[in-house]
Regions:
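Bacterial N-terminal signal peptides that target proteins for export
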Residues: 1-10
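Bacterial N-terminal signal peptides
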Residues: 10-19
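Boundary at the C-terminal end of the N-terminal hydrophobic targeting segment
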Residues: 24-28
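Von Willebrand factor
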Residues: 30-159, 162-166, 172
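Acidic/histidine-rich, surface-exposed loop or edge segments in extracytoplasmic proteins
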Residues: 30-44, 127-133, 210-214
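Extracytoplasmic/secreted cell-surface and envelope-processing proteins
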Residues: 44-48, 80-84, 173-177, 219-224, ...
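Von Willebrand factor type A / integrin I
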Residues: 187-262
């Protein structure tokens, strides 16, 4: 009988031990990594930049929580050769609770301390964003392709959920590719995508949730052609880019948990 009792109790003890000591009992999520590329080309007017700033300050920043990462970088004509983040922060993660080692009151105090740190860092980032947006940047070209290659590097081995936000009109404008001068057609899109793929200019963004805010062009027809190109581009990159998240303003924010799932 004692042996039977021991056999009955042992699994229960093991389950209790796992529940109290396993991080999954009260583990924090891995968080979200939000990378923002901001268009500083001459085609972006001051009104558009002001809207970008509002979207960062009123939508993106408030959605960040403990454990999240934010990086903001420019889209300009020297993205690859002179890349430098404009703003970056990693918010401290919420502490995990273990029934074996943690006192409840002590744990709650640690959580409160982290929450205060997160609020302070977000306020600091808001000030930094305002400082960046207040400066006079103006690039002669818009090299979005290079920015997306940088995004691939930034997301490499990133354990957090990956979200890419492009604040741009999405008009590539470089000596090699000028979207306003292309005679757009379905065959032209496929030809350009094949050329970019052959030149290794389509990054690997598998599992990255993509948002575009600021998409525009001189005509509705051109805007639609460019949107169709980017739809094919991101599909080849492996990113999660839905047409509903490609717009003139930031829509459907914050990202749903299913955004990065293919």
């Amino acid at each position: 009988m004692p042996g039977a009792l021991h056999r009955a109790i042992t699994p229960a003890v093991l389950l209790l031990t796992q529940a109290l000591s396993s991080p999954s009992a009260a583990a924090t999520s891995t968080g979200t990594a939000v990378i923002i590329f901001l268009d500083f080309s001459g085609s972006i007017q001051s009104g558009e930049r002001a809207r970008y700033q509002r979207e960062i300050e009123t939508l993106i920043l408030p959605s960040l929580s403990a454990g999240d990462r934010l990086l903001m970088a420019p889209i300009h004509d020297k993205t690859l050769t002179e890349f430098r983040p404009l703003v970056q922060v990693i918010l401290p993660a919420k502490p995990e609770f273990s029934g074996w080692r943690d006192n409840v009151l002590t744990y709650k105090r640690r959580v409160k301390e982290v929450e205060t740190q997160v609020l302070d860092l977000k306020a600091k980032v808001k000030t930094e964003v305002a400082g960046v947006m207040g400066k006079r940047y103006s690039s002669p070209y818009t090299d979005i392709f290079s920015s997306l290659l940088i995004a691939q590097k930034l997301f490499h081995d990133e354990p957090r959920r990956k979200v890419l936000v492009l604040l741009s009109d999405m008009i590539e404008d470089t000596p090699e590719y000028n979207f306003e001068k292309i005679a757009w057609s379905p065959s032209a899109v496929e030809k350009l995508l094949a050329e970019l793929e052959a030149k290794a200019l389509i990054p690997k963004l598998l599992g990255v949730c993509v948002y575009v805010s600021g998409a525009s062009a001189k005509s509705a027809a051109l805007a639609e052609d460019i949107a169709r190109f980017w739809e094919g581009y991101f599909r080849r990159s492996g990113a999660d880019m839905q047409p509903s998240r490609y717009a003139h303003v930031l829509l459907h924010w914050p990202p749903s948990q299913s955004c990065h799932q293919q």
